[in-house]
Amino acid sequence: MRKVTLTLSAIALALSLNGAAMAKVHMPEVVSPGVTVTELAHQQPIKWVSVAEIEKSLEGQAPMAVGFDIDDTVLFSSPGFYRGKLEYSPNDFSYLKNPEFWEKMNNEWDKFSMPKQVGIDLVQMHLKRGDTVYFITGRTQTKTETVTKYVQEGLNIPADKMQPVIFAGDQPGANNKVSWMRDHKLKIYYGDADADIAAADELNIRGIRILRAANSSYQPLPKAGQFGEEVVINSEY
């Protein structure tokens, strides 16, 4: 009986000490509603799609021609654009009209660009299907370029499967990508910009949005999914 009494006393003491300790735990002042992991997982009501789901949607279809934008779609190329702005027009965006900048960007500064994982995954998926992959960029064309080289190396594209990068250029009031997309009979086009989705819509082909990284030099960020297009999940990197 004495052992039982001592045991119960020990338990009671432990509980009382634990309660006292709990009562003394300091908690900071609550200053915001906070968020749970479940709440973080809630997405906007748009058409999210994964690479695997895109691949599944193409099952049974013959090989086709597909296209990709480059900057912020398959390459994070902001380092070069950031450098160009600082060097040629720190107070505005006139550097984008400067031929000297484009000579640098198209021939040297892509060595600082990082391939996006979503670009690698999508391109490899299409190559596995036997699709022909084209890259159409809004960059200004230059006499020479190494963009094709860096895209091929960064996305692990075999030399015999790599098409030369198409430089559509950027003219106010015109979407220069449309004619190239039409000429190459694209069935799908991936891009981060509203103009990419608009070009696909104009040709009535499947336009799929890639998320632009939040730290991209190309601001403001577009509203992905606003046109009802599919948006690739986790495609910001």
UniProtKB/Swiss-Prot annotation:
Keyword Ligase carried by entry: no
Cofactor(s) this protein requires: Mg(2+)
Key words, A-Z: Hydrolase, Magnesium, Metal-binding, Periplasm, Signal
Catalytic activity: a phosphate monoester + H2O = an alcohol + phosphate
Record: active site: 69 (nucleophile), 71 (proton donor)
Subcellular location: Periplasm
Top-level enzyme category: hydrolase
GO molecular function, a single term: metal ion binding
Cofactor note: Binds 1 Mg(2+) ion per subunit.
Residues that coordinate or bind Mg(2+): 69, 71, 192
Binding site for substrate: 137-138, 177
InterPro entries reported in the protein's UniProt record: Acid_phosphat_B-like, HAD-like_sf, HAD-SF_ppase_IIIB_AphA, HAD_sf
CC terms in the record's Gene Ontology section: outer membrane-bounded periplasmic space
Gene3D superfamilies according to UniProt: HAD superfamily/HAD-like
UniProt keyword annotation of Glycoprotein present: no
Protein name: Class B acid phosphatase
Lineage: Bacteria, Pseudomonadati, Pseudomonadota, Gammaproteobacteria, Enterobacterales
